[in-house]
Amino acid sequence: MFRSTFFGLSRAIVQPATPLTVRAAFQSRFYSAAAAASQPTTTATTTTPLQQQQQQQPTTQPTTPIQTQTGAAPTESTKPVAKPYLVGRAWTQRLPVYHLAKRGGNKKLTQIKKVQGDGQALRRDLAQFLGLEVKEVRVKVPTGHLEVDGHRREEIVKFLDGLGF
């Protein structure tokens, strides 16, 4: 016996010691004890047509696996190349590349956050991709940020996506 609550009401539920068959449960509910004792109870189980069909079918598995092609196999050019740096993603699964405006809006910057590893290598690769001088890309080592002169978010995101970040 255990207690059950349903919408704040408490009630005791008695579970039978042995599981009852459907017929025995029906008899105990709708017939008196004397009438139930006079009728023989059977424990034969009934099967549905679906269960009979499943029992008749053989249970062998095919010997050859089915091979499906879901797309082109990755080639050497599409595999991401291992780099000495990593740019993590924000909690929204977007790349952490942001536009900044300083000095009253006169100085436009693009900031890359969550840079891990060799920031100088990322600085060189990014400057080469953007066609900038290396001095126009700055590494902020304590914070793990890179700053690029100008608003270049779309180009930087394209570069980072191309690397597989």
Swiss-Prot record:
Transmembrane segments: none annotated. Keywords: Mitochondrion, Ribonucleoprotein, Ribosomal protein. One of its GO terms (cellular component) is mitochondrial large ribosomal subunit. Coiled coil: none annotated. InterPro entries: Ribosomal_mL49 (IPR007740). It is found in: Mitochondrion. Belongs to the mitochondrion-specific ribosomal protein mL49 family. This is Large ribosomal subunit protein mL49.
